[in-house]
Amino acid sequence: MKALSPVRGCYEAVCCLSERSLAIARGRGKSPAAEEPLSLLDDMNHCYSRLRELVPGVPRGTQLSQVEILQRVIDYILDLQVVLAEPAPGPPDGPHLPIQTAELAPELVISNDQRSFCH
């Protein structure tokens, strides 16, 4: 078994600490109670960024306020509800026939001749 240097062991232990703990240990951070509002603000900003990415129709190059982002999200949810509330289109005037594999991808269908080579 190899002996570990004390410096390397300390380095590995420090790397495992969270950023907040490391900042407090170095003395440049504030108390956890003082940092909590900042981390909540970062979390909220991250959430608004994710909403902006996920909702279609939000322009990429323009700056939107948080209220505008929320309004676009609400509009998108309402649009989805309308689409889901519409009745599904019914089958055509004939009987409903299941789709066969041969209709989807005929090249995947194995004939009896080819099947005999498999065994």
Swiss-Prot record:
One of its GO terms (biological process) is notochord development. It comes from the Eukaryota. Disulfide bonds: none annotated. It holds the Pfam family HLH. The keyword Nucleus applies. InterPro entries: bHLH_dom (IPR011598), DNA-bd_prot-inh (IPR026052), HLH_DNA-bd_sf (IPR036638). GO terms for cellular component: cytoplasm; nucleus. Keywords: Biological rhythms, Myogenesis, Nucleus, Repressor, Transcription, Transcription regulation. It is found in: Nucleus. GO terms for molecular function: bHLH transcription factor binding; leptomycin B binding; protein dimerization activity; protein domain specific binding; transcription corepressor activity; transcription regulator inhibitor activity. Residues 28-80 form the bHLH domain. CDD domains: bHLH_dnHLH_ID3. SMART domains: HLH. PANTHER family: DNA-BINDING PROTEIN INHIBITOR, DNA-BINDING PROTEIN INHIBITOR ID-3. Transcriptional regulator (lacking a basic DNA binding domain) which negatively regulates the basic helix-loop-helix (bHLH) transcription factors by forming heterodimers and inhibiting their DNA binding and transcriptional activity. Implicated in regulating a variety of cellular processes, including cellular growth, senescence, differentiation, apoptosis, angiogenesis, and neoplastic transformation. Involved in myogenesis by inhibiting skeletal muscle and cardiac myocyte differentiation and promoting muscle precursor cells proliferation. Homodimer, and heterodimer with other HLH proteins. Interacts with COPS5 and COPS7A. Interacts with IFI204. Interacts with GATA4 and NKX2-5. Interacts with ANKRD2; both proteins cooperate in myoblast differentiation. Interacts with CLOCK and BMAL1. This is DNA-binding protein inhibitor ID-3. It comes from Bos taurus.
